[in-house]
């Protein structure tokens, strides 16, 4: 038979539970206060603080790994490449190319010309000093050019240079076709727009709502919706 607790024992248990609840409330209050202080401190930090922190940590780790590789007499760049998959390496290379010569779409003809110029300059081969000195010796004073200098028939392009020019022109033509592709207008299609901007807007609406409005549109065309 279970022993009946006395009033003093019951009171002691209640006090113990109240004390435990009080401790938990104090702990929760302390935790909440610390979280509020931490959140306020985070709000006062710059917007890009987390990114800068991650970058600083990455730089420290990279410097440490580089120093360890040098101490062991190993090529750090080669070790890094061994840890990168072919897919990631290709993605990094493409990202680097986009950063060096980004394609932001057409803005002005001057910007497009400057972008093409930078791309062509970067694709130029390394300078051949021997060829430079040889041409300088062959052409003499005409090498630097002047108001009355004529180099016609005195210079000859190599087959490799000609092939490179042809290849580059073909690539430019292909890129121009891709960026300047015009969509053929269908004469039999319904005309539900008043200009090009309105046509694009209607196409966006069709992508989202055509399945819901197809029946209503058909009824309106047949005149059965009245």
UniProtKB/Swiss-Prot annotation:
A GO-annotated cellular component: U2-type catalytic step 2 spliceosome
Subunit field text: Identified in the spliceosome C complex.
UniProt entry tagged with the keyword Transmembrane helix: no
Name of the protein: Pre-mRNA-splicing factor Syf2
Any one biological process term the GO annotation gives: mRNA splicing, via spliceosome
Function text: Involved in pre-mRNA splicing as component of the spliceosome.
Coiled-coil region: 1-29
UniProt keyword Coiled coil, yes or no: yes
Single GO MF descriptor: RNA binding
One Pfam family cited in the UniProt record for this chain: SYF2
Compartments, as annotated in UniProt: Nucleus
Residue stretches spanning the membrane: none
Domain of life: Eukaryota
Sorted UniProt keywords: Coiled coil, mRNA processing, mRNA splicing, Nucleus, Spliceosome
Family according to the record: Belongs to the SYF2 family.
Primary subcellular site in the record, as a coarse category: nucleus
InterPro entries, per the entry: mRNA_splic_SYF2
Organism encoding this protein: Drosophila melanogaster
